[in-house]
């Protein structure tokens, strides 16, 4: 027993140092492993190229991100909902009682809460200002994105009426201050708020009226319209597209999740819509490497590297005791871990033509094994494609393979096999053979026709039937193999061939390489299974929104030959000569499909939807920069991009920066991306679009540019009649109903303020204007507004606050001044409370109190209303779903492998 344990431990140690050797199964790779490997190789290549450049490029020496963690993060975003289900709308108005029995103050609580979002605006920090705008937009969407279900109601004389808790007005605290007749009027108004029955599609709902702030109501209406529209067809369209995708990917639909959408008590909600607009994903600046690695991690199946029957070698290249030909010499070699990494690169290049291409790895010691090089020259012509539409290798590697094949045909020169050289002296420019001489120019690389490689004489890129993804209509057919064929490894490949393989056998026979020709002929079924599996993987598993678009795919080879730089230049990975042999005698056999394959459409949709939302944010921030240049005087287009990225979900940001591409994104990329018209419709996008439409009026975000200075005295009324004073409900505010006359306003720009400050006359000029009862406006700045209520005299820092900051200091004997217009303005409301014991001059002071700042807003945030009109704001029509209705968010159910009951509406 101890001996067996020692042998087992020894075997485990050997496997630890040789992880690729396990009998016929050499290695097992899956999508995440290969994606990390590909990303490491790509980043290593990028860093090496940058170190070789004469000009210093941005340093990207960062850690390699974990692709699966990023994808899992995006999948986790699907759990987040862009709405909430509540049983009562939020209170949009609150009532402040006064000493008057006839009047009360009503405050729009939405604007009150909005004023608390964010800090002061700084004109020298554009990113901070943009972040403030995005934060306010997020608050606006969270306030209005709600669905009502199971609202509280009452029975009154056989009618169903609304409970006071759901009408959106908080007034109970003011009832004790009102007269009995006014309370009765309010009660009668409440008794008349009848709940009506309505229909959404064919679903029964409750319809009632409530008070709601206009911005919240607009967001709420958009959400309600989105849900109502889904009931009529969007779900059916999504399911039909998933069925098309399942047929293309050969995914069987399971019956694990069946939902009967025809039930009249079900309302379904879809946050993400299908199909995906893949152009949104590919419009992202510098995205092709990130999309490539995401495609690998998301869709590539788990597979193992299998070797052919070893008897093929025994009856062909190793049948003699004395082994002198190149194939027989290397047939017993065992690959190292580095060489197996090169095999991985080769299969990645075969699975991603025109995206990953290969080049020969330069040997620093100049000690290339001539045997391996010649064998690789032969096998490379039947392993790789070089034209006319796609390629797996660079032009340099094609020339090296031609030279290696030429050396292989000529290394045993003798009189028995004559050779007639051509006039050019280039590799393969000769005719070889005794009787029927073969023109070896047929194997010299020509990317225009694909001559010499697998693409010659076959149509390896076709557009046969419509694809579920509009941007990828191509079907890859390596070796003219249809990927829809059933592959049985026991019989597949028998009596199959393709043009370049036939020509290779003819050339080897003409050159007297009978053993090698016999070996390749016996390897042909194994070789055809290899490319049949690759075709299946490319056309089925790897088909996704992250696949390279046809318009980019078709021009890669042309740009590569002409030396043109495109948007999606291929990634070049270097391999050794030996790895071509090891890749030829191994094939990638899928053993399990990716675990993320069924959820891939939803992950793609969520990613595209977030990108569309970010793109809209950049567009709107750039427009806002043009509207209020004084607010962001030093802003650049790249700062819009940075602010949006800062606000984006972390998984989305990490996926966009998967290859550290943010270090290379320039202003041109940002502007072009923000001007793209492709969008991915989703609930989040629709809500964000409406939120930006609301934000066009800055006052809805509690940002105001009409802030003035005028010196006025704080009202100090005489208390001649305390009852009358109480009845009027006297209050004071620094918010004015209308803007002052233009002729009375002195507008101070930065230039004017700096000029007067440098002349030492700034404070004197301000004082002179205020003494003349004039108005002063400092710039066109947007200032954040705070709302405060006082029942006694406000503090001096609020009354005497100025909408600017003026600093003066002396540096090295030089007087320095600085201005800052971006300050927070306070809108205060002073409620006067008096007692019967007060004398007429109780509110009067000997020295008057002055207030300086005046704010003009078109929005009426605080209103004084008559007591019977407390419910006058209850004028918005709302739809609420009944408590027994089922609100089902079926977004997570839109998976490729889940068959849903199709709606019949």
Swiss-Prot record:
Keyword DNA repair: no
Chief location: virion
InterPro entries referenced in this protein's UniProt entry, alphabetically: Inner_layer_core_VP3_Orbivir (IPR002614), Inner_layer_core_VP3_Reovir (IPR016029)
GO molecular function: structural molecule activity
GO CC annotation: virion component
Localization annotation: Virion
Keyword annotations of the record: Virion
UniProt entry tagged with the keyword Transmembrane helix: no
Functional description taken from the UniProt entry: The VP3 protein is one of the five proteins (with VP1, VP4, VP6 and VP7) which form the inner capsid of the virus.
Family designation: Belongs to the orbivirus VP3 family.
Stated name of the protein: Core protein VP3
Species: African horse sickness virus 6
Gene: Segment-3
């Amino acid at each position: 027993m101890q001996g067996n344990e020692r042998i087992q431990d020894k075997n485990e140690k050997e496997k630890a140092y040789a992880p690729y050797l396990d009998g016929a199964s050499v290695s097992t790779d899956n999508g995440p492993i290969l994606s990390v490997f590909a990303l490491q190789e790509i980043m290593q290549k990028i860093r090496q190229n940058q170190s070789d450049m004469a000009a210093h490029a941005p340093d990207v020496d960062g850690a390699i991100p974990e692709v699966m963690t990023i994808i899992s993060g995006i999948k986790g975003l699907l759990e987040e909902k862009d709405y909430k289900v509540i049983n009562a709308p939020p209170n949009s108005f609150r009532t402040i009682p006064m000493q008057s029995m006839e009047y009360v103050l009503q405050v729009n609580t939405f604007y009150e809460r909005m004023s608390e979002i964010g800090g002061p605006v700084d004109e020298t920090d554009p990113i901070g200002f943009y972040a403030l705008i995005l934060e306010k937009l997020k608050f606006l969407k969270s306030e209005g994105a709600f669905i009502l279900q199971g609202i509280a109601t009452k029975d009154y004389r056989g009618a169903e009426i609304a409970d006071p808790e759901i009408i959106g007005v908080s007034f109970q605290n003011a009832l004790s201050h009102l007269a009995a007749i006014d309370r009765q009027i309010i009660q009668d108004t409440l008794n008349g708020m009848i709940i009506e029955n309505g229909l959404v599609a064919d679903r029964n709902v409750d319809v009632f009226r409530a008070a709601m702030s206009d911005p919240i109501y607009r967001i709420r209406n958009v959400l309600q319209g989105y849900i109502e529209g889904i009931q009529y067809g969007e779900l059916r369209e999504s399911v039909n597209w998933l069925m098309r995708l399942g047929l293309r990917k050969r995914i069987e639909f399971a019956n694990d999740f069946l939902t009967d959408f025809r039930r009249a008590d079900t309302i379904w909600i879809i946050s993400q819509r299908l199909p995906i607009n893949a152009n949104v994903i590919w419009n992202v600046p510098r995205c092709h490497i990130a999309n490539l690695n995401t495609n690998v991690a998301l869709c590539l199946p788990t597979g193992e590297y299998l070797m052919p029957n070893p008897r093929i070698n025994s009856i062909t290249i190793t049948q003699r005791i004395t082994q002198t030909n190149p194939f027989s010499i290397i047939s017993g070699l065992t690959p190292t871990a580095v060489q197996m990494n090169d095999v991985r690169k080769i299969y990645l290049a075969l699975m991603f033509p025109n995206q990953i291409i290969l080049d020969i790895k330069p040997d620093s010691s100049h000690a290339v094994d001539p045997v391996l090089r010649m064998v690789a020259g032969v096998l490379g012509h039947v392993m790789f494609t070089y034209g006319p539409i796609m390629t797996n290798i660079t032009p340099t590697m094609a020339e090296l393979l031609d030279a290696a094949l030429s050396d292989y045909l000529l290394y045993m020169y003798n009189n028995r096999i004559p050779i007639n050289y051509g006039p050019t002296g280039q590799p393969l420019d000769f005719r070889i053979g005794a009787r029927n001489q073969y023109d070896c120019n047929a194997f010299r690389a020509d990317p225009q026709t694909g001559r010499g490689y697998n693409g010659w004489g076959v149509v390896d890129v076709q557009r046969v039937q419509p694809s579920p993804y509009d941007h990828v209509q191509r079907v890859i057919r390596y070796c003219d193999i249809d990927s829809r064929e059933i592959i049985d490894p026991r019989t597949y490949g028998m009596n199959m061939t393709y043009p370049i393989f036939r020509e290779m056998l003819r050339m080897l026979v003409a050159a007297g390489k009978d053993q090698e020709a016999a070996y390749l002929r016996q390897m042909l079924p194994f070789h055809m299974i290899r490319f049949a599996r690759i075709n299946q993987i490319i056309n089925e598993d790897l088909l996704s929104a992250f696949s390279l678009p046809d318009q980019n795919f078709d021009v890669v080879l042309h740009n590569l030959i002409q030396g043109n730089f495109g948007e999606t230049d291929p990634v070049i990975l270097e391999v050794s000569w030996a790895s071509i042999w090891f890749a030829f005698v191994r094939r990638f056999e899928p053993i399990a499909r990716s675990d993320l394959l069924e959820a891939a459409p939803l992950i793609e949709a969520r990613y595209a939807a977030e990108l569309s939302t970010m793109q809209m944010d950049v567009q709107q921030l750039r427009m806002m920069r043009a509207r209020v240049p004084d607010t962001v005087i030093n802003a650049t287009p790249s700062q819009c991009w940075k602010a949006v990225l800062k606000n984006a979900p972390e998984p989305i940001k990490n996926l966009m920066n998967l290859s550290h591409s943010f270090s290379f994104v320039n202003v041109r990329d940002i502007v072009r991306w923000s001007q793209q018209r492709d969008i991915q419709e989703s609930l989040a996008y629709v809500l964000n679009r409406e939120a930006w439409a609301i934000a066009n009026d800055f006052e809805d975000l509690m940002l105001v540019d009409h802030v003035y200075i005028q010196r006025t005295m704080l009202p100090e009324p005489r208390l001649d009649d305390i009852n009358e004073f109480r009845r009027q409900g006297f209050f004071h505010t620094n918010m004015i109903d209308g803007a002052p006359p233009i002729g009375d306003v002195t507008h101070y720009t930065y230039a004017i303020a700096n000029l007067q400050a440098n002349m030492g006359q700034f404070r004197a000029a301000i004082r002179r204007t205020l003494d003349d009862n004039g108005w002063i406006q400092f710039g066109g700045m947007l200032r954040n507004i705070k709302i405060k209520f006082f029942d006694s005299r406000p503090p001096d820092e609020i009354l005497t606050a100025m909408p600017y900051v003026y600093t003066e200091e002396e540096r090295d004997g030089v007087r320095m001044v600085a201005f800052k217009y971006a300050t927070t303005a306070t809108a205060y409301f002073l409620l006067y409370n008096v007692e019967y014991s007060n004398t007429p001059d109780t509110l009067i002071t000997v020295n008057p109190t002055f207030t300086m700042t005046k704010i003009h807003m078109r929005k009426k945030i605080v209103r004084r209303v008559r007591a019977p009109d407390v419910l006058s704001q209850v004028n918005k029509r709302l739809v609420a779903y009944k408590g027994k209705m089922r609100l089902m968010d079926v977004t997570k159910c839109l998976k490729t492998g889940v068959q849903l009951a199709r709606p019949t509406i």
